[in-house]
Amino acid sequence: MTETKYSAVIIAKNDESTIGECILAMQKLTNDILIVLDDRSDDNTENICLQHGVRLIKKTWEGYSGNKNFGADHGKNDWILCPDADEVFDDVLIQKLKEINPKDDQVYEMNRLTYFMKTAVKHSGWFPDWNIRLYNKKSMRWNDNLVHESLESTYPLRRQRLSGIVRHYSFRDENHMKEKYDIYAKLRANEWIKANKRPSIFKMWFGPYFRFVRTFILKLGFLDGKTGYTIAKNDFILKRKEIYYWRQFPKSASNVQ
């Protein structure tokens, strides 16, 4: 067991296909694992978590940031491991986390390798993909962004990158990707409305096309073959949906739960 005491906080909803493996990796690092389960979850996620003997709190959805901060507040330790429910730390990363002595003025980034179905995607702008997965809750909180929430601090913190990989099983198939992207598009549209922002004419007319070119050509998505094309195509659709929902939604309260 690592000398530093960690708490693992994982927010989840309908993650029965991945949550078990995520928990098993965390159990190699800490005995304090808290699952903050969206109370609308209706698959077998809750039972799987309880079978693994972790703490579980069912909670009304308050957004990604709200539920993550809630979980961190209920962690028993200051250092918080924060994998997504579809992420699994590999053995190299786990060993590194056992060896390090985290510094209070640092946050720790880990390299995420995303899988589309069973294919590891190493281009298309998806890899390398460094994300903070270890932080001290005394110095950082999640901001209130509706999508792509991030950690913020009142004073500068140094970023330290750790060796190893976070395996990210994000999309079971293309339909699953479309479902997730539709949620992301609604969240982005609401974020613009919340900030009283209007997409530029360029973004409205050319943004989707630029995103396809960026993913498939500039980010070498063509090297990912058919998978790369599928990702680029859905990136195009995502950008069109962001504009569509921004136009359709009332320019006031949030429209997505």
Spans of model-derived segments:
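Short, structured coil segments at secondary-structure junctions
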Residues: 29, 52-53, 130, 155
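N-proximal low-complexity "stem/linker" segments adjacent to membrane-targeting elements
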Residues: 1-25, 255-256
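A conserved acidic beta->alpha catalytic loop
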Residues: 16, 25, 29, 35-47, ...
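Catalytic metal- and UDP-sugar-binding loop of GT-A-like glycosyltransferases, i.e.
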Residues: 59, 83-85
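Conserved donor nucleotide-binding strand/loop of the catalytic core
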Residues: 31, 46-76
